[in-house]
């Protein structure tokens, strides 16, 4: 077995970025990451988690995922888009999330952009979907960004989205399964054998 795959406490082989002691990351890896979805709230959640991960670690973000879900109304785009300055002030004091005002404001602005953007985020995600014949053989094969992610980020910025650089957009693409970067040998990889 490759060093890019670890065996979890449950005996399942996973991508090595999931530490065996991090149940929040393992749950996200097993149930969400790399699973193709075009559901509006799932797309908004992935986009939001990427905004908050910028400059931090995914472990911190995964540990606060339930807090984000509560703070941002279950990632209901209309409700988040209707949030006010008072709501933002309240969230800056909420210890269940990452209390970064710029990222909270970006999340509200991104919800507003999602409500008005054409083409929609789902349509854009579909247009950038990657079909691979084989899974990456190692973590080293997984890029931080791609030309497709750069183009996708540029389109999102033109629609008013914030905190959407090529690296965070590539992470978004991974999160929603537009690209499946589960490493060969992981039980979620497309070609496990």
State where each predicted segment sits.
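HhH-family (HhH-GPD) DNA N-glycosylase catalytic core used in base-excision repair
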Residues: 1-193
């Amino acid at each position: 077995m490759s060093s890019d795959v670890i065996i979890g406490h449950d005996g399942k082989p996973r991508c090595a970025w999931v530490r065996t002691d991090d149940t929040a990351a393992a749950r996200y890896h097993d149930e969400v990451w790399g699973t193709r979805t075009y559901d509006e709230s799932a797309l908004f959640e992935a986009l939001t988690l990427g905004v908050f991960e910028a400059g931090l670690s995914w472990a911190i973000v995964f540990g606060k995922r339930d807090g984000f879900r509560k703070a941002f109304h279950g990632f209901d785009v209309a409700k988040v888009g209707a949030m006010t300055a008072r709501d933002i002030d309240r969230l800056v004091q909420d210890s269940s999330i990452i209390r970064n005002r710029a990222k909270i404001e970006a999340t509200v602005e991104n919800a507003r952009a999602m409500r008005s953007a054409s083409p929609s985020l789902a349509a854009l995600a579909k247009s950038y979907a990657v079909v691979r014949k084989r899974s990456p053989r190692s973590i080293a094969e997984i890029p931080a960004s791609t030309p497709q992610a750069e183009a996708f980020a540029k389109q999102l910025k033109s629609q008013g989205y914030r905190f959407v650089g090529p690296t965070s957009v590539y992470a978004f693409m991974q999160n929603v399964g537009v690209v499946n970067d589960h490493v060969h040998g992981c039980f979620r990889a497309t070609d496990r054998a």
